[in-house]
Swiss-Prot record:
PROSITE patterns: SAM_DOMAIN, U_BOX, WD_REPEATS_1, WD_REPEATS_2, WD_REPEATS_REGION
Protein species of origin: Mus musculus (Mouse)
GO MF terms held by the record: ubiquitin-protein transferase activity
Keyword entries, A-Z: Phosphoprotein, Repeat, WD repeat
Residue ranges annotated for the U-box domain, each copy included: 401-474
Residues modified to Phosphothreonine: 456
Signal peptide: none
Lineage of origin: Eukaryota, Metazoa, Chordata, Craniata, Vertebrata
Superkingdom per UniProt: Eukaryota
Pfam families associated with the record: SAM_2 (PF07647), U-box (PF04564), WD40 (PF00400)
This protein's name: WD repeat, SAM and U-box domain-containing protein 1
Residue span, SAM domain: 330-394
Length: 474
């Protein structure tokens, strides 16, 4: 189910962090650099490595749109880069100038949080690059940070072992002693926990120097307010756990440890699914890709390993039309794995009984889903069609040569006036306004309720599209 498909060995010192966008992988290191790779063939981009920091780089992360990359360093700065060109967009200096240990974007790309060794946490406006709010924890370094999927709050973890929950106005909502010897990482699952009416509940994982991974339920209620509740502990590591990350469907949690191993935990009936032992020194970071089951793990052995869980064999050689090649040649089993990845496990039996392979999948319509496959649930049919449309959209954009991130997910056309919705995705303004005016208050991409109907102009993406158009005009 999981296999090593590629190893990156370009850094000259410990790998400290890795992060995915839909099309790229970013890695950073104590060697002061950030490197960018294409997910199509894992080739390093022409403008990589990115160089600005004067000391070790501790963390890197993409904005939800994938157009901006943030990196932070011992030099006391957080740098924002264009992921399309490698150009520096701005340099944010941490209040007090302390080494910055962690950074993360809010789901709507509106804010960037940066946490430092002096315990300060800065919340920046990611559009204007101005400091919005600042807070701090006492007697500890901030080493971990994660926003809730709805963007309503974020959690920080400290070297003292405390999980602290903040709202978007930097008010401290709660502080919990989570790991006796210090926290090293925390991560939210993108999938909400089931709850009653009026409840918003999300799963949070934290790990630490106590060799443990703990799962928490973070719940926001209209009546009782906020609650952080301990759920369970995942075991398996025999040394401090340095990193943890949920898969995009929330069904797996990866963890990396001083014991040099990576463990893939199942969520639900908790179990160890896989133990990966390829690294020869401490595993410092792990990250899942947002839309495919790829996992990257980084280590003090200066390497980043790429692991694949399902579907296609990586294309070797030319990648002119990889998605179309892979999808059309999917076997029936590949389609079954894809269904599970989309959260459509209940349809696996129906698809297998009707021998749906990749080619048949691409030709399914609402009529065939209802008439031929006898899928009675309108919600299930709609979710299948949306997922298939995403595959077709990516194929269309690849075949036309237009970068996928420039294509509106609703119209499947090149965006002219891109805006960021509250689900973190970018859309053509007119298409998204029409979507909302039809009283569709759910995300076109995730089908989850939109936390807000506010649309924020994506100026960075618009500039990138205009530059691309200029270079492709004949």
């Amino acid at each position: 189910m999981v296999r090593l498909i590629h190893t990156l060995a370009d850094h000259g010192d410990d790998v400290s962090c890795c992060a995915f966008s839909a099309a790229l992988l970013a890695t950073c290191s104590l060697d002061k650099t950030i490197r960018l790779y294409s997910l199509s063939d894992f080739a390093e981009l022409p403008y990589s490595p990115l160089k600005f920091h004067t000391y070790a780089v501790h963390c890197c992360c993409f904005s939800p749109s994938g157009h901006v990359l943030a990196s932070c360093s011992t030099d006391g700065t957080t740098v924002l880069w264009s992921s399309h060109s490698g150009h520096t967009l701005t340099v944010l200096e941490q209040p007090g100038g302390s080494p910055v240990r962690v950074c993360c974007f809010s789901p709507d790309s509106a804010y960037l949080a940066s946490g430092a060794a002096d315990g300060s946490i800065a919340l920046w406006n990611a559009q204007t690059y101005k400091l919005y709010r600042c807070g701090s924890v006492k007697d500890s370094s901030l080493v971990a940070c994660a926003f809730s999927p709805d963007g309503g709050l974020f959690v920080t973890g400290s070297s003292g072992g405390d999980l602290t929950v903040w709202d978007d106005r930097m008010r401290c909502l709660h502080s919990e002693k989570a790991h006796d010897l210090g926290i090293t990482c925390c991560s939210f699952s993108s999938q909400p926990l089931s709850g009653g009416e009026g409840l918003q509940s999300y799963q949070l994982a934290s790990c630490g120097q106590d060799c443990e991974i703990k799962l928490w339920a973070v719940t926001i209620t209209r009546v009782l307010g906020f609650e952080l509740k301990y759920k369970s502990t995942l075991s398996g590591h025999c040394a401090p756990v340095l990193a943890c990350a949920f898969s995009h469907d929330g069904k797996m949690l990866a963890s990396g440890s001083v014991d040099k191993s990576v463990i893939i935990h199942g969520i639900g009936p908790q179990s160890v699914l896989h133990t990966l032992t390829q690294h020869t020194r401490y595993v410092t970071t792990c990250a899942f890709a947002p839309n495919t089951l790829l996992l990257a793990t980084g280590s003090m052995d200066k390497t980043v390993n790429i692991w694949q869980f399902d579907l296609e064999t990586p294309c070797q050689g030319s990648m002119n039309d990889p998605l179309k090649h892979f999808t059309e040649e999917w076997s029936e089993e590949d389609v079954s794995v894809w269904l599970r990845a989309q959260g459509l496990e209940d349809l696996v039996g129906i698809f297998r009984a009707n021998n749906i392979d990749g080619k048949e999948l691409l030709h399914l319509t609402k009529e065939s889903l209802a008439g031929d496959l006898k899928i009675e649930s309108l919600g299930l049919r709609s979710k299948v069609l949306r997922s298939i449309e995403e595959l077709r959209a990516k194929m269309d954009s690849l075949s036309s040569g237009i970068p996928d991130e420039f294509i509106c997910p609703i119209t499947r056309e090149l965006m002219k006036d891109p805006v960021i919705a509250s689900d973190g995705y970018s859309y053509e303004r007119e298409a998204m306004e029409s979507w909302i005016h039809k009283k569709k208050r759910t995300s076109p991409m995730t089908n989850l309720a939109l936390p807000s109907l506010v649309l924020t102009p994506n100026r960075t993406l618009k500039m990138a599209i205009n530059r691309w158009l200029e270079t492709h005009e004949k």
